[in-house]
């Protein structure tokens, strides 16, 4: 497996535990899920942590969302038709329908950087030395 993330968010997820969870469940893909009340991709997660459905960009009302940190097996490339494939649409939705997408629930720090306000907040964390995602010296 390999790790993939989007470039617009930070978090303090334990990558070793994420990879271990992925390997234990033997599915093609595992994404990190967080609880957030904003407009993001909504996950319908079953009792076994399998993702039952994946809907991008709707109002969440406190539902878990895709935090953008993933562990993927090479078979993921069979789900990508080409450069025009929207990863959050075809591949993730199809994997969920096939029972091949797992969710790893993260309860620590996570923040996207989709707006100037969010960027300013994250830069303030860095400037003051209080960035909760920074786990290195």
Predicted regions and their residues:
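Catalytic-core segments of class I nucleotidyltransferases/pyrophosphorylases
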Residues: 2-3, 10, 16-23, 36-37, ...
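Small/polar loops that bind or transfer phosphate-bearing groups
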Residues: 6-7, 31
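A short, conserved acidic/glycine-rich loop-to-beta-strand motif
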Residues: 25-35
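Extended acidic/charged loop-beta regions that coordinate divalent cations
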Residues: 45-46
């Amino acid at each position: 497996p390999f790790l993939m993330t989007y470039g617009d968010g930070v978090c303090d997820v334990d990558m070793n535990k994420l990879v271990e969870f992925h390997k234990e469940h033997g599915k093609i893909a595992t994404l990190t899920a967080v609880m957030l009340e904003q407009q993001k991709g909504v996950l319908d997660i079953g009792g076994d942590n399998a993702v039952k459905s994946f809907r991008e960009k709707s109002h969440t009302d406190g539902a878990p969302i895709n935090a953008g940190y993933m562990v993927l097996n090479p078979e993921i490339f069979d789900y990508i038709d080409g450069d025009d494939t929207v990863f959050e649409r075809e591949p993730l939705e199809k994997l969920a329908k096939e029972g091949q997408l797992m969710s790893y629930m993260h309860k620590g720090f996570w923040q996207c950087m989709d707006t100037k306000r969010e960027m300013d907040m994250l830069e303030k964390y860095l400037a003051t030395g209080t960035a909760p995602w920074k786990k290195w010296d």
